[in-house]
Regions:
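A charged N-terminal "starter" segment
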Residues: 1-161, 165, 193-199, 233-235
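A short small-residue
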Residues: 24-32, 202-208, 244-251
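Glycine-rich tight-turn/loop motif centered on a GG-T
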Residues: 33-35, 115-119, 138-143, 175-186, ...
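Conserved radical SAM core fold
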Residues: 78-82, 126-128, 168-182, 207-212, ...
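Short beta-strand segments
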Residues: 120, 146, 164-168, 204-206, ...
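Conserved strand-turn element in the central/C-terminal portion of the radical SAM core barrel
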Residues: 142-143, 201-213
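Metal-dependent enolase-superfamily TIM-barrel catalytic cores that perform enediolate-based chemistry
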Residues: 152, 182-195, 216-226
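C-terminal active-site-proximal or functional interface alpha/beta core segments in diverse enzymes
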Residues: 213-268
Length: 268
Protein backbone atom coordinates (compact mmCIF):
# COMPACT_ATOMS: atom_id res chain seq x y z
CA UNK A 1 0.00 0.00 0.00
CA UNK A 2 1.05 3.62 -0.66
CA UNK A 3 4.20 2.53 -2.51
CA UNK A 4 3.86 5.57 -4.78
CA UNK A 5 4.97 7.72 -1.86
CA UNK A 6 8.23 5.88 -1.21
CA UNK A 7 11.52 5.60 -3.07
CA UNK A 8 15.20 4.80 -2.46
CA UNK A 9 18.06 7.29 -2.87
CA UNK A 10 21.28 6.55 -4.77
CA UNK A 11 22.84 5.76 -1.39
CA UNK A 12 20.18 3.15 -0.71
CA UNK A 13 18.35 5.23 1.90
CA UNK A 14 14.57 5.24 2.27
CA UNK A 15 12.91 8.38 1.00
CA UNK A 16 9.33 9.65 1.13
CA UNK A 17 7.78 11.94 -1.47
CA UNK A 18 5.10 14.56 -0.74
CA UNK A 19 4.28 16.18 -4.04
CA UNK A 20 7.61 17.54 -5.30
CA UNK A 21 9.19 17.54 -1.85
CA UNK A 22 11.27 14.65 -0.52
CA UNK A 23 11.99 13.46 3.04
CA UNK A 24 15.11 11.40 3.68
CA UNK A 25 14.10 9.00 6.46
CA UNK A 26 17.70 8.12 7.34
CA UNK A 27 18.50 11.81 7.92
CA UNK A 28 15.48 12.15 10.24
CA UNK A 29 16.60 9.11 12.24
CA UNK A 30 20.14 10.49 12.52
CA UNK A 31 18.76 13.85 13.66
CA UNK A 32 16.20 12.65 16.23
CA UNK A 33 17.48 9.18 17.17
CA UNK A 34 15.50 6.01 17.70
CA UNK A 35 12.93 4.84 18.36
CA UNK A 36 11.26 7.29 15.99
CA UNK A 37 7.62 7.36 14.97
CA UNK A 38 6.97 9.23 11.73
CA UNK A 39 3.41 10.15 10.79
CA UNK A 40 2.44 11.32 7.31
CA UNK A 41 -0.86 13.22 7.65
CA UNK A 42 -1.20 13.72 3.89
CA UNK A 43 -1.26 9.94 3.32
CA UNK A 44 -3.89 9.48 6.03
CA UNK A 45 -6.00 12.28 4.55
CA UNK A 46 -5.72 10.83 1.04
CA UNK A 47 -6.81 7.36 2.17
CA UNK A 48 -9.86 8.65 4.06
CA UNK A 49 -10.84 11.00 1.23
CA UNK A 50 -10.47 8.17 -1.30
CA UNK A 51 -12.64 5.80 0.78
CA UNK A 52 -15.46 8.32 1.17
CA UNK A 53 -15.30 9.38 -2.50
CA UNK A 54 -15.49 5.78 -3.76
CA UNK A 55 -18.49 4.97 -1.57
CA UNK A 56 -20.29 8.13 -2.67
CA UNK A 57 -19.53 7.41 -6.33
CA UNK A 58 -21.03 3.92 -6.13
CA UNK A 59 -24.05 5.21 -4.20
CA UNK A 60 -24.72 7.63 -7.05
CA UNK A 61 -24.02 5.01 -9.74
CA UNK A 62 -26.52 2.60 -8.17
CA UNK A 63 -29.06 5.37 -7.49
CA UNK A 64 -29.00 4.54 -3.78
CA UNK A 65 -30.86 7.18 -1.79
CA UNK A 66 -29.13 6.57 1.53
CA UNK A 67 -25.90 8.11 2.77
CA UNK A 68 -22.49 6.76 3.77
CA UNK A 69 -20.63 7.88 6.90
CA UNK A 70 -17.15 6.72 7.83
CA UNK A 71 -16.35 6.21 11.52
CA UNK A 72 -12.68 5.96 12.40
CA UNK A 73 -12.09 3.31 15.12
CA UNK A 74 -10.00 5.00 17.81
CA UNK A 75 -8.51 1.67 18.91
CA UNK A 76 -6.33 1.73 15.77
CA UNK A 77 -4.34 4.80 16.83
CA UNK A 78 -5.24 7.40 19.47
CA UNK A 79 -2.44 9.90 18.74
CA UNK A 80 -3.76 13.34 17.82
CA UNK A 81 -1.31 13.44 14.88
CA UNK A 82 -3.30 10.55 13.43
CA UNK A 83 -6.82 11.39 14.60
CA UNK A 84 -6.92 15.04 13.48
CA UNK A 85 -6.04 14.34 9.81
CA UNK A 86 -8.76 11.67 9.76
CA UNK A 87 -11.53 13.96 11.02
CA UNK A 88 -10.29 16.83 8.84
CA UNK A 89 -11.44 14.79 5.83
CA UNK A 90 -14.94 14.26 7.21
CA UNK A 91 -14.56 11.10 9.27
CA UNK A 92 -16.66 10.53 12.36
CA UNK A 93 -15.33 8.59 15.35
CA UNK A 94 -15.87 5.25 17.05
CA UNK A 95 -14.64 4.36 20.53
CA UNK A 96 -14.42 1.01 22.29
CA UNK A 97 -13.42 2.09 25.81
CA UNK A 98 -13.68 4.88 28.34
CA UNK A 99 -10.04 5.82 27.72
CA UNK A 100 -10.70 6.40 24.03
CA UNK A 101 -13.81 8.46 24.76
CA UNK A 102 -11.80 10.55 27.23
CA UNK A 103 -9.44 11.44 24.35
CA UNK A 104 -12.47 12.46 22.28
CA UNK A 105 -13.62 14.62 25.20
CA UNK A 106 -10.23 16.37 25.41
CA UNK A 107 -10.17 17.05 21.66
CA UNK A 108 -13.71 18.45 21.85
CA UNK A 109 -12.80 20.67 24.82
CA UNK A 110 -9.83 21.97 22.82
CA UNK A 111 -12.27 22.77 19.97
CA UNK A 112 -10.47 20.44 17.54
CA UNK A 113 -13.80 19.42 15.99
CA UNK A 114 -17.36 20.72 16.02
CA UNK A 115 -20.34 19.14 17.73
CA UNK A 116 -21.74 17.85 14.41
CA UNK A 117 -19.28 14.98 14.49
CA UNK A 118 -20.92 11.68 15.45
CA UNK A 119 -19.30 9.35 17.98
CA UNK A 120 -20.31 5.69 18.24
CA UNK A 121 -19.46 4.02 21.55
CA UNK A 122 -18.81 0.28 21.28
CA UNK A 123 -17.39 -2.20 23.75
CA UNK A 124 -18.20 -3.18 27.33
CA UNK A 125 -19.42 -0.14 29.26
CA UNK A 126 -17.62 0.46 32.56
CA UNK A 127 -18.99 3.03 35.00
CA UNK A 128 -16.41 5.55 33.79
CA UNK A 129 -17.36 4.91 30.17
CA UNK A 130 -21.09 5.29 30.91
CA UNK A 131 -20.53 8.54 32.82
CA UNK A 132 -18.50 9.99 29.94
CA UNK A 133 -21.21 9.04 27.44
CA UNK A 134 -23.86 10.85 29.49
CA UNK A 135 -21.59 13.85 30.13
CA UNK A 136 -20.78 14.42 26.46
CA UNK A 137 -24.41 13.91 25.49
CA UNK A 138 -25.44 16.63 27.96
CA UNK A 139 -22.79 18.94 26.49
CA UNK A 140 -24.21 18.58 22.99
CA UNK A 141 -21.85 16.07 21.38
CA UNK A 142 -23.61 13.55 19.11
CA UNK A 143 -22.92 10.43 21.17
CA UNK A 144 -24.54 7.13 20.19
CA UNK A 145 -23.90 4.25 22.61
CA UNK A 146 -24.06 0.79 21.02
CA UNK A 147 -25.87 -1.56 23.42
CA UNK A 148 -24.06 -4.90 23.72
CA UNK A 149 -25.80 -6.78 26.56
CA UNK A 150 -28.81 -6.83 28.91
CA UNK A 151 -27.39 -4.54 31.63
CA UNK A 152 -26.57 -1.87 29.07
CA UNK A 153 -30.05 -2.22 27.58
CA UNK A 154 -31.56 -1.55 31.00
CA UNK A 155 -29.20 1.38 31.70
CA UNK A 156 -29.92 3.19 28.42
CA UNK A 157 -33.70 3.02 28.83
CA UNK A 158 -33.40 6.43 30.48
CA UNK A 159 -30.93 7.80 27.91
CA UNK A 160 -32.47 10.65 25.92
CA UNK A 161 -30.20 10.45 22.88
CA UNK A 162 -30.01 7.96 20.03
CA UNK A 163 -28.82 4.42 20.77
CA UNK A 164 -27.64 1.52 18.65
CA UNK A 165 -27.68 -2.21 19.32
CA UNK A 166 -25.13 -4.85 18.39
CA UNK A 167 -25.98 -8.22 16.90
CA UNK A 168 -23.70 -11.24 17.19
CA UNK A 169 -24.39 -12.90 13.85
CA UNK A 170 -23.89 -16.61 13.38
CA UNK A 171 -21.75 -16.24 10.26
CA UNK A 172 -18.28 -17.62 9.63
CA UNK A 173 -15.90 -15.80 7.28
CA UNK A 174 -12.35 -16.44 6.18
CA UNK A 175 -9.94 -13.96 7.70
CA UNK A 176 -6.22 -13.62 8.33
CA UNK A 177 -6.98 -13.91 12.06
CA UNK A 178 -9.12 -17.01 11.61
CA UNK A 179 -9.62 -17.96 15.23
CA UNK A 180 -12.23 -17.74 17.97
CA UNK A 181 -13.00 -14.29 19.30
CA UNK A 182 -14.90 -13.17 22.36
CA UNK A 183 -18.44 -12.49 21.16
CA UNK A 184 -20.29 -9.30 21.99
CA UNK A 185 -23.87 -8.35 21.25
CA UNK A 186 -27.20 -10.14 21.16
CA UNK A 187 -27.76 -13.33 19.19
CA UNK A 188 -30.20 -12.87 16.32
CA UNK A 189 -33.13 -14.61 18.01
CA UNK A 190 -32.55 -12.62 21.23
CA UNK A 191 -32.47 -9.38 19.27
CA UNK A 192 -35.80 -9.99 17.56
CA UNK A 193 -37.45 -10.80 20.90
CA UNK A 194 -36.51 -7.41 22.38
CA UNK A 195 -39.32 -5.63 20.55
CA UNK A 196 -39.39 -1.84 20.64
CA UNK A 197 -36.23 -0.11 21.91
CA UNK A 198 -36.38 3.56 22.81
CA UNK A 199 -34.55 5.86 20.35
CA UNK A 200 -33.03 2.95 18.42
CA UNK A 201 -31.30 4.33 15.33
CA UNK A 202 -28.47 1.89 14.50
CA UNK A 203 -28.12 -1.84 14.00
CA UNK A 204 -24.43 -2.66 14.49
CA UNK A 205 -22.23 -5.69 13.95
CA UNK A 206 -18.54 -6.58 13.76
CA UNK A 207 -17.79 -9.79 11.94
CA UNK A 208 -13.97 -10.13 11.85
CA UNK A 209 -10.70 -8.43 10.89
CA UNK A 210 -8.69 -8.71 7.67
CA UNK A 211 -11.46 -10.56 5.83
CA UNK A 212 -9.93 -12.44 2.90
CA UNK A 213 -12.81 -12.48 0.39
CA UNK A 214 -15.45 -10.08 -0.90
CA UNK A 215 -18.02 -12.76 -0.12
CA UNK A 216 -16.94 -12.57 3.52
CA UNK A 217 -17.73 -8.85 3.51
CA UNK A 218 -21.05 -9.11 1.68
CA UNK A 219 -22.64 -12.13 3.43
CA UNK A 220 -22.98 -10.44 6.85
CA UNK A 221 -24.39 -7.31 5.24
CA UNK A 222 -27.14 -9.36 3.58
CA UNK A 223 -27.96 -10.94 6.93
CA UNK A 224 -27.91 -7.54 8.65
CA UNK A 225 -30.34 -6.11 6.06
CA UNK A 226 -32.80 -8.95 6.76
CA UNK A 227 -32.59 -8.30 10.51
CA UNK A 228 -32.88 -4.56 9.90
CA UNK A 229 -36.14 -5.03 7.97
CA UNK A 230 -37.63 -7.21 10.72
CA UNK A 231 -36.57 -4.79 13.49
CA UNK A 232 -38.05 -1.78 11.71
CA UNK A 233 -41.50 -3.31 12.10
CA UNK A 234 -41.38 -2.31 15.79
CA UNK A 235 -38.65 0.33 15.55
CA UNK A 236 -39.58 2.61 12.61
CA UNK A 237 -36.94 5.16 13.65
CA UNK A 238 -34.17 2.63 12.91
CA UNK A 239 -32.37 4.03 9.85
CA UNK A 240 -28.71 2.93 9.89
CA UNK A 241 -26.62 -0.23 9.65
CA UNK A 242 -23.13 0.04 11.12
CA UNK A 243 -20.90 -2.27 9.05
CA UNK A 244 -18.12 -3.58 11.28
CA UNK A 245 -15.20 -5.62 10.03
CA UNK A 246 -11.81 -5.15 8.45
CA UNK A 247 -10.81 -5.50 4.82
CA UNK A 248 -8.05 -7.90 3.89
CA UNK A 249 -4.35 -7.16 3.47
CA UNK A 250 -2.47 -8.89 0.60
CA UNK A 251 0.55 -10.29 2.43
CA UNK A 252 1.48 -12.46 -0.54
CA UNK A 253 1.93 -11.68 -4.23
CA UNK A 254 -1.28 -13.25 -5.44
CA UNK A 255 -4.61 -12.03 -6.79
CA UNK A 256 -6.57 -10.14 -4.15
CA UNK A 257 -9.75 -8.08 -4.19
CA UNK A 258 -9.52 -4.30 -4.45
CA UNK A 259 -11.23 -1.75 -2.25
CA UNK A 260 -13.30 -0.58 -5.22
CA UNK A 261 -14.52 -4.10 -5.96
CA UNK A 262 -15.50 -4.64 -2.32
CA UNK A 263 -17.33 -1.31 -2.06
CA UNK A 264 -19.18 -1.95 -5.31
CA UNK A 265 -20.49 -5.29 -4.01
CA UNK A 266 -21.38 -3.80 -0.62
CA UNK A 267 -23.47 -1.02 -2.18
CA UNK A 268 -25.19 -3.39 -4.63
Amino acid sequence: FNTQYFDVTKKGELMLKEGNYQYNIAELVNKYGTTLEIVFPFIIEARVRNLIDIFNAYLKLNDYKGRFFYHYPMKVNQNREFVLPVISEGANLETSSGNELWIVKRLWEQEKFNSKIRVLCNGPKTTTYLNLIEELDRKGVMITPIIEEEQELEFFKRYKGEVGIRVDMDIKVRSHWDKKFNHFGFHEDELLKLGKIRNLGILSYHISSQIETVKGLVAPIKRAVMLYAKMREKNPQLDTINIGGGGGVPYEKKKFYTGKAAINRIVK
